[in-house]
Amino acid sequence: MGLMKTKAISSIFVLFAIAAGMASMAPAAFADHAEVTIVTVDESGFSQTCAASQGGPGCYTPVTATVDVGGVVTMTNTDPTGVHTFTSGTVDGFAPSPDGKFDTGMLMSGDSFEWTPTVSGEYPYYCMLHAWQVGTITVN
């Protein structure tokens, strides 16, 4: 009877250790993409030179951002010289086509907008005022 009790206690201990190990790993696995901040490049409204299509690094930083479903995307206008938007959709040439998934409206320098995606996928976005400013949010 003592041997069975010892095995039962050992089994419970092993299960507890496995559960504790899994729980401690879960936050680290999701923390990488729980939130992301996207900012505008300074003076990106004055010139298209920041645009990737013009050989620049992109007018938003990062140009491609990744976040988990339920994570928080913070979009901030850090450009002290201009008003910008972060509007979901695409641009064909200079013809914007919003898709209604998110739209910050006009953000003055220092203003921010938060969006919490609920569906995975690729979300292209652009600035309604400066159509060369484009980026993509990948939601996993």
Where are these regions (language model features)?
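Bacterial N-terminal signal peptides
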Residues: F13-S24
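N-terminal amphipathic/basic-hydrophobic helices that include classical n-h-c signal peptides
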Residues: M1-L3
